[in-house]
């Protein structure tokens, strides 16, 4: 299990864009399971939607990508690198995510060759499917250019 400080030591995301609160399970380079506690105070609820707050679907996908990044960047040979989001396939949203929900975010790396890979992501709330997608990524080094 990884807490928020340990997650921040692995991926560079910070508030308001860090969308993972805890990693519950991890197999380095293979899979990870994380959670995001969706608070009524999330900044995106100000405009999405003021009278009917719903977590934007793209942020659910981003949360899945961050969990996948933790799985890949926890591997010794990838430490200190960045995981760049390069594509989405077969993305479907099945249920709305609202304040008070806890998102369970599961990502399995289904292909990794060199710095390029693909993960299968599934997000649920209370055991009900919210989103499923395939996420493509590329690992890169930090540059000061």
Swiss-Prot record:
This is 3-hydroxyacyl-[acyl-carrier-protein] dehydratase FabZ. SUPFAM superfamilies: Thioesterase/thiol ester dehydrase-isomerase. One of its GO terms (molecular function) is (3R)-hydroxyacyl-[acyl-carrier-protein] dehydratase activity. It comes from the Bacteria. Involved in unsaturated fatty acids biosynthesis. Catalyzes the dehydration of short chain beta-hydroxyacyl-ACPs and long chain saturated and unsaturated beta-hydroxyacyl-ACPs. Keywords: Cytoplasm, Lipid A biosynthesis, Lipid biosynthesis, Lipid metabolism, Lyase. It catalyses: a (3R)-hydroxyacyl-[ACP] = a (2E)-enoyl-[ACP] + H2O. Transmembrane segments: none annotated.
């Amino acid at each position: 299990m990884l807490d928020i400080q340990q997650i921040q030591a692995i991926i560079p995301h910070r508030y308001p864009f860090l969308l993972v609160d805890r990693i519950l399970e991890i197999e380095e380079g293979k899979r990870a399971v994380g959670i995001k506690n969706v608070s009524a105070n999330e900044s995106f609820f100000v405009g999405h939607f003021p009278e009917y707050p719903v977590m934007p679907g793209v942020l659910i996908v981003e949360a899945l990508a961050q969990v996948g990044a933790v799985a890949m960047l926890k591997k010794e040979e990838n430490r200190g690198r960045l995981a760049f989001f390069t594509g989405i396939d077969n993305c479907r949203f099945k249920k709305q995510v609202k304040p008070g929900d806890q998102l369970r975010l599961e990502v399995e790396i289904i292909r990794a060759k060199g710095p390029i890979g693909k993960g299968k992501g599934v997000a649920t709330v209370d055991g009900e499917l919210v989103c499923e997608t395939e996420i493509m990524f590329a690992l890169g080094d930090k540059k000061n250019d």
